[in-house]
Amino acid sequence: MLDIALVRRDPDRARQSARRRGIDDSFVDEILRLDTQYRSALAQAEQLKAQKNQLSAQIGKAADKAAAAQELRPRLDAISAAFALADEGARALAPDALGSPLRALLENTPNILDDAVPDGSGSDENVLVRAWGTPRVFSFEPKPHYELGEALGILDFERAAKLSGSRFCVLRNKGAQLQRALARFFLDRAAAAGYEEIAPPLLVTRETMWSTGQLSKFSDAMFADPEADLFMIPTAEVPLTALHGGEILDAAALPVKLTAHTPCFRKEAGAAGKDTRGLIRQHQFEKVELVWLSAPEESFNALERLTADAEAALQELELSYRTMLLCAGDTSFNSAKTYDLEVWLPSANSYREISSCSNCTDFQARRASIRVRRDPRAKPEFVHTLNGSALAIGRTLLALLENGQQADGSIVLPRALVPYTGFERIS
């Protein structure tokens, strides 16, 4: 949720960020108008409260309290009633009041972009930061992962469709073993980098989804149980970020570094006709997520470290990739700055996203009320939250199939993975 104090202090920055995202910036004027209305109502309530307190004190100091009370009571009652109405009205207009128009605007306004984010409207204007590895040159025409997997009997899309419909896959034999091995490999790397492993619930409340910025903006993309009002997580970012919701952390506890391996569930409602074959875009997929809770002044350094943790996994798996800084129009609703890691896919002769690493600054923490107290006498302040995949398991698996394929259709796995799989080749 956007910080009302930031909009008050620097409305031009909020306008500029919106325009850079390709959004009409007129909402900033509406926020300021509603905020002025709220502060005017608050000032009126405070003025009436002061008058009420003054009259009460006057009665208390009178020599003849009974006479003073009889004389001033009608006026005191009238002011008290007016104050109660004014106070109720001001509270209803407050930026943190449920149902207030001001809160609704702040909730549906994307995060303020960091100044380092480049201008641009779409993915073709993202900026290359660095690249690692050299895409393999094949002596034969490389096949897509779904053809390789079906021929090897490790990916079964036909039976998955029989069970669940489109955008599902059954992993079999060494395919299922490879998925499990990747999860262990990623979790071990995260543990070595200082992350605490969490096994969170896969169903979360509406409040949890809202607190991490998934609702109401992305409600159409979620699988939910309306009767129980529970949502299947679209990413472990949701329960990991909200884990410390409503808490005040000690400064010494920061940064909090969490990781989880979970299935994730998404409707992919806006992806009709895109990536209809294979593992790229599934309704259910596995992922290892990294989440940081950081001191505000450290969060952009933390983003570099989190991104480096995700990159290290790709390097150990010997997968060529590139790191892209997302442009303004491609940066997500919650994020102030995002790096995408894109892995090389030979069959497409292009790079595809395998991880997205974001600094959400205080945007999610403000919703979830995650704060830090630096000093016993200091006022708590919101932490900054960061998240990234390290990595998406299905997309890593398909990248391994495509990049490790041999002319005979077998797959050679990277050396770092063999202790986890127990085999170095799928044939």
Residue ranges and their predicted role:
Residues 1-136, 154:
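N-terminal alpha-helical targeting/anchoring segments
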Residues 131-427:
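TRNA-recognition modules of translation machinery and tRNA-sensing kinases, especially anticodon-binding
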